[in-house]
Amino acid sequence: MARSVWKGPFVDAYVLRKAEKARESGKSDVIKIWSRRSTILPQFVGLTFGVYNGQKHIPVSVTEEMIGQKFGEYSPTRTYYGHAADKKAKRK
């Protein structure tokens, strides 16, 4: 079920504070965040966030198309290695 419109988008308070501080300083450093559940807002465009995937921070450069999505969508938590090959089929 989607979030109701009257509530507005959810963003952790510390993410807003870090983004505001980065905007004021003008530095282009990676902003490390652990909040994968936070929504990407228009004021985040142009900033680079390091989104934690459980092991390391994946750098995510925010663009216009990402607005309204969640940070977690751009930092995969699982590695796909492909399906195991059929050993019987290889021998023939």
UniProtKB/Swiss-Prot annotation:
The keyword Protein biosynthesis does not apply. Gene3D superfamilies: 30s Ribosomal Protein S19, Chain A. It comes from the Bacteria. It holds the Pfam family Ribosomal_S19. PROSITE patterns: RIBOSOMAL_S19 (PS00323). GO terms for cellular component: cytoplasm; small ribosomal subunit. One of its GO terms (biological process) is translation. GO terms for molecular function: rRNA binding; structural constituent of ribosome. Keywords: Ribonucleoprotein, Ribosomal protein, RNA-binding, rRNA-binding. Protein S19 forms a complex with S13 that binds strongly to the 16S ribosomal RNA. PANTHER family: RIBOSOMAL PROTEIN S19P FAMILY MEMBER (PTHR11880), SMALL RIBOSOMAL SUBUNIT PROTEIN US19M (PTHR11880:SF8). Belongs to the universal ribosomal protein uS19 family. This is Small ribosomal subunit protein uS19. The gene is rpsS.
